[in-house]
Amino acid sequence: MNHATQRVAIVTGASRGIGAAIAERLAADGFTVIINYSGNPAPADELVGKIEQRGGRALSVKADVSDAAAVAGLFDSAEQAFGGVDVLVNNAGVIALAPVADMRDEDADRLLDINLKGSFNAMREAAKRLRDNGRIINFSSSVVGLLQPGYGMYAASKAAIEALTSVLAKELRGRNITVNAVAPGPTATGLFLDGKTPELIERLAKMAPLERLGTPDDIAAAVAFLAGADGGWINGQTLRANGGII
């Protein structure tokens, strides 16, 4: 694929974990990838180097998705470097767990600012600036269906994403842009594993009929399907990539 026809994908929160796996997979599939990060640039820059060593094209761009102006700047950078954007993968997110009665205001605000408002900011920008025949892929979570104690605010922030996904898919009628969400189950990332005992991790791994945790590559494969030609008839849906946990 030559550079003039290469499709361009923005992946938010892409410097590590699931986001990094998505960036690598999309680059392997022929996409130019914008690797968004919000903190330390080193992992994002390292990932750019890895993709370029394999013959791909990538650019790291710092932006806090909870800041609408920063998200607009993220799209500006992509357009200036590569001429436009075809795919948005709304991967950036945080987690904070507590029973509803014990949830701190600052934790609730951060969940809503990043998981909901951050995803909304990127969706809004993509709705205005994505090229026709594009893809918007949001991130929900399988906790929306599991409804576990302690996950209330986190699940709420992700349930809202599923609603926005279905609505935006209808609002973009006529442009051949699909809007879907991926809802991972327990996945072996640092974000998921940190603070958990080996016994708890083993118990969580056994919850799904496939009796293992998901991997970042499992989730990246689901995203790649939705971003590619084979996923073109899927629209307004949430794909639950969780090994059958629900």
Describe the residue ranges of each PLM region:
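Short C-terminal tail/terminal secondary-structure segment
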Residues: 146, 206, 224, 235-246
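Active-site helix of classical SDR
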Residues: 123, 157
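Active-site loop-to-helix junction immediately N-terminal to the catalytic Tyr of the SDR YXXXK motif
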Residues: 95, 103, 147-155, 167
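Conserved glycine-rich cofactor-binding loop
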Residues: 15-16
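Substrate-binding pocket helix/loop in short-chain dehydrogenase/reductase
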Residues: 99-100, 104-112, 192, 200, ...
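Alpha-helical segment proximal to the catalytic Tyr-Lys
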Residues: 128-129, 170-174, 232
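Conserved glycine-rich Rossmann-like NAD(P)H-binding loop of the short-chain dehydrogenase/reductase
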Residues: 29-46
